């Protein structure tokens, strides 16, 4: 069995990124702010603004966090998976309501595709397009085959 690294691949760059994310989310996602944002309207039909703050999302984009693992050839930064993990962990600690995790999931799925349309989608993600996945069976249905 291969021994796993004790730091799970976190190098100096990833540690600095994690520290920056921790500070960003502490400064911008206090429990009171998050509660005020999402708890005032429990309806499933509430407007998107009550679910996630688009101006805060734009700051995440400007910090390069949506592009952190996207290859440089597609407009990203090209860091390893642990860079996204560092950001995602801090986002989760603060209960940051956003499409960040779904965007990361889409990013890694698209990276595995390595096609022109996938690379175009990666470039869109790198510039701030919030993204998610829709997975269907071979017939295009959500139901089991």
Positions of the model-derived regions?
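Short alpha-helical scaffold segments that flank and stabilize functional sites
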Residues: 17, 24, 64, 106-112, ...
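Short secondary-structure boundary/hinge segments and terminal tails
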Residues: 43, 77-78, 104-109, 142-143
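Short connector loops at helix/strand junctions that flank enzyme active sites
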Residues: 82, 103, 127-128
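Amphipathic, small/basic residue-rich leader segments at the start of a protein or domain
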Residues: 1-100
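Glycine-rich, Trp-frequent "lid" loop and neighboring beta-strands that shape
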Residues: 76-77, 96, 112-145
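N-terminal glycine-rich flavin-associated loop
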Residues: 36, 97-116
């Amino acid at each position: 069995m291969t021994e796993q690294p004790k730091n799970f691949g976190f190098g100096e760059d990833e540690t600095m990124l994690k520290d920056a994310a921790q500070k960003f989310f502490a400064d911008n996602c206090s429990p009171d702010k998050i509660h005020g944002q999402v708890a005032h309207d429990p309806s499933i039909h509430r407007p998107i603004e009550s679910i996630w703050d688009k101006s805060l999302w734009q700051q995440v984009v400007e910090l390069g966090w949506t592009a952190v693992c996207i290859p440089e050839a597609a407009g990203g930064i090209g860091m390893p998976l642990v860079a996204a993990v560092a950001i995602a962990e801090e986002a989760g600690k603060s209960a940051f309501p956003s499409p960040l995790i779904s965007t990361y999931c889409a990013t890694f799925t698209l990276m595995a595709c390595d096609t022109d349309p996938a690379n175009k989608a990666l470039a869109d993600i790198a510039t701030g397009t919030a993204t998610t996945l829709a997975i269907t069976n071979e017939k295009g249905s959500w139901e089991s085959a």
